[in-house]
C-alpha cells in the first residue's frame, strides 16, 4: 500500500484548465464513488477548490499506476491526457505526506498562510468519510495533517499578519480602536472586498454596521448575511457623523466623500477621531480629508505597504513552519513504516502463545499421571528451548552457507546475540 497525491493547482495550471478539472459539489459523491471503484484504489479523498484539484489516495503500487490514475481523471472530465499531463504533479510516500501537510497549513496557497484551505481540506475529508472512502492509513494521514496545521498556526506567526486588502483594513481598524465592540462602521460599496471586510468585522463583533451602495438590492443581501443596516448613498452625508470607521470600495469615477462632508461629520461628533480607509481605485474619498486634524485617512497604497511588510513576516514564519512540516512528516512516515511489521508481530505472538499452550498441556498431563515434577520441568525446558531455536538456527546456517553477511548480521541483531 502506498500513499499518493495527484493534482493541479494555481502554480501549474491556468484557471481555464483548473475549471475543467474541478469537481463540483453536486458531482463530488459520484466522482468519489467512481474513484473508489478503481481496482488500484483502496481509499481516497478529493479536494477541489478554485485554486487546486487534488486526489489523495492509498493505492496498490504498480508499474502503470500513474498512467491509470491520469486516465481515470481525464476520462471522468472528458479530457485528453495530453491536455493535462504537463500541469499535473505526482507525489508518492513521504513527498505525498509532506505535500498534504503543507497544503493544510497554508504553505502551498496562493496567499501564503491563508486559513481557509484548512477548512476546505477538512470538508473534503468529511465527504470521503461519509462515502466510506477512508482506509486506516489515509484517515491517520489526514488527522495528522490537521494536527500539524494547528501546530503551525500555534507555534508560528504564519497567519498573524494581514496579506489581503480586506483583512489589512480590518487589522488597521483593530489596531486604532482597542475594541470594536463599541464602534460603528460605515461600509460604502457591496463588492467582494467590502463583503470580506463585513465578514471580518462581524467576526470581531462590531457594535453597528452600516452599508451604503449604489444598488440597494445587493447591499440588502449582504446586510442580511452580516447583520447590518442599509442606507442610500444620498444618506451618507447625514449618517457620516455616526460612524467611527468608514471603509470604502466602489467603482465610482468621482469621490463619494468630500472634505466638507467629513468636516460636518467631525463637528457633529464633537471632533471625536474618525478612521477613513479608502481602498477604491479611483479614490472614493477626497485626498484633502487627510489634512483634517481628527480624520485619519488611509488609501490602498498605505494598505499595500502594510501588506508587503506583513507578507515578509509571513515568509519568515514560513521557514519555521516548513521545519515543523519536515519533522512531522518524518515522524508520520516512521509510524507508517512500523505498520508493515504489525501483522508479522501479531503472527509471531500467536505462534508463541500456541507453543506455550502445547508445552504447558504436556507438562500438566505428565504431572496428572504422577511424573516427578522436577523432571517434568527439566524436560519441558529442554524441549521448548530446542523448538524455539530450531527455525532461527536453520536461518543462521543458510545465511552462512550462502555467504550472506548482511542477512547474518540482521539475524544476530534480531536474536540479540551482540548485546553483550
Swiss-Prot record:
UniProt family annotation: Belongs to the glutamyl-tRNA reductase family.
Important for activity (site feature) positions: 99
Protein name: Glutamyl-tRNA reductase
Keywords: NADP, Oxidoreductase, Porphyrin biosynthesis
Gene Ontology biological process terms in this record: protoporphyrinogen IX biosynthetic process from glutamate
UniProt organism field: Sodalis glossinidius (strain morsitans)
Miscellaneous note of the record: During catalysis, the active site Cys acts as a nucleophile attacking the alpha-carbonyl group of tRNA-bound glutamate with the formation of a thioester intermediate between enzyme and glutamate, and the concomitant release of tRNA(Glu). The thioester intermediate is finally reduced by direct hydride transfer from NADPH, to form the product GSA.
Record note on quaternary structure: Homodimer.
Record-linked SUPFAM superfamilies: Glutamyl tRNA-reductase catalytic, N-terminal domain, Glutamyl tRNA-reductase dimerization domain, NAD(P)-binding Rossmann-fold domains
Record-annotated active site: 50 (nucleophile)
Signal sequence annotation: none
Cited Gene3D superfamilies: Glutamyl-tRNA reductase, N-terminal domain, NAD(P)-binding Rossmann-like Domain
The EC number(s) this enzyme carries: 1.2.1.70
Amino acid at each position: 500500500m502506498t500513499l499518493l497525491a495527484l493534482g493541479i493547482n494555481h502554480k501549474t495550471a491556468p484557471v481555464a484548465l483548473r475549471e475543467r478539472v474541478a469537481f463540483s459539489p453536486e458531482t463530488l459523491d459520484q466522482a468519489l464513488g467512481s474513484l473508489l471503484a478503481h481496482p488500484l484504489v483502496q481509499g481516497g479523498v478529493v479536494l477541489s477548490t478554485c485554486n487546486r484539484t487534488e486526489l489523495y489516495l492509498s493505492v496498490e503500487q504498480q508499474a502503470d499506476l500513474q498512467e491509470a490514475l491520469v486516465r481515470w481523471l481525464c476520462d471522468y472530465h472528458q479530457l485528453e491526457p495530453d491536455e493535462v499531463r504537463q500541469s499535473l504533479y505526482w507525489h508518492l510516500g513521504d513527498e505525498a505526506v509532506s505535500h498534504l501537510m503543507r497544503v493544510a497549513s497554508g504553505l502551498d496557497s496562493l496567499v501564503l498562510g491563508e486559513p481557509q484551505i484548512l477548512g476546505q481540506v477538512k470538508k473534503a475529508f468529511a465527504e470521503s468519510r461519509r462515502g466510506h472512502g477512508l482506509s486506516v492509513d489515509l484517515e491517520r494521514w489526514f488527522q495528522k495533517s490537521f494536527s500539524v496545521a494547528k501546530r503551525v498556526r500555534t507555534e508560528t506567526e504564519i497567519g498573524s499578519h494581514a496579506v489581503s486588502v480586506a483583512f489589512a483594513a480590518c487589522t488597521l481598524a483593530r489596531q486604532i480602536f482597542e475594541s470594536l465592540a463599541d464602534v460603528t462602521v460605515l461600509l460604502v460599496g457591496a463588492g467582494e472586498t467590502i463583503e470580506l471586510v463585513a465578514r471580518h468585522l462581524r467576526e470581531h463583533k462590531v457594535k453597528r454596521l452600516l452599508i451604503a451602495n449604489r444598488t440597494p438590492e445587493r447591499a440588502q443581501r449582504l446586510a442580511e448575511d452580516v447583520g447590518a443596516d442599509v442606507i442610500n448613498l444620498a444618506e451618507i452625508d447625514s449618517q457620516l457623523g455616526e460612524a467611527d470607521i468608514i471603509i470604502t470600495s466602489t467603482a465610482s469615477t468621482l469621490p463619494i466623500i468630500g472634505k466638507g462632508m467629513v468636516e460636518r461629520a467631525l463637528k457633529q461628533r464633537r471632533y471625536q477621531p474618525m478612521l477613513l480607509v479608502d481602498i477604491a481605485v479611483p479614490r472614493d474619498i477626497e485626498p484633502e480629508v487627510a489634512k483634517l486634524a481628527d480624520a485619519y485617512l488611509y488609501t490602498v497604497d498605505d494598505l499595500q505597504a502594510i501588506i508587503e511588510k506583513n507578507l515578509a513576516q509571513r515568509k519568515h514564519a514560513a521557514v519555521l513552519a516548513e521545519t515543523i512540516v519536515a519533522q512531522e512528516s518524518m515522524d508520520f512516515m516512521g509510524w507508517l513504516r512500523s505498520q508493515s511489521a504489525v501483522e508479522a508481530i501479531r503472527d509471531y505472538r500467536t505462534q508463541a502463545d500456541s507453543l506455550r499452550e502445547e508445552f504447558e498441556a504436556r507438562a500438566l498431563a505428565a504431572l496428572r499421571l504422577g511424573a516427578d515434577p522436577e523432571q517434568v520441568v527439566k524436560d519441558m525446558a529442554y524441549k521448548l528451548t530446542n523448538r524455539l531455536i530450531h527455525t532461527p538456527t536453520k536461518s543462521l546456517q543458510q545465511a552462512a552457507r550462502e555467504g550472506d553477511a548482511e542477512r547474518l548480521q540482521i539475524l544476530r541483531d534480531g536474536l540479540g546475540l551482540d548485546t553483550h
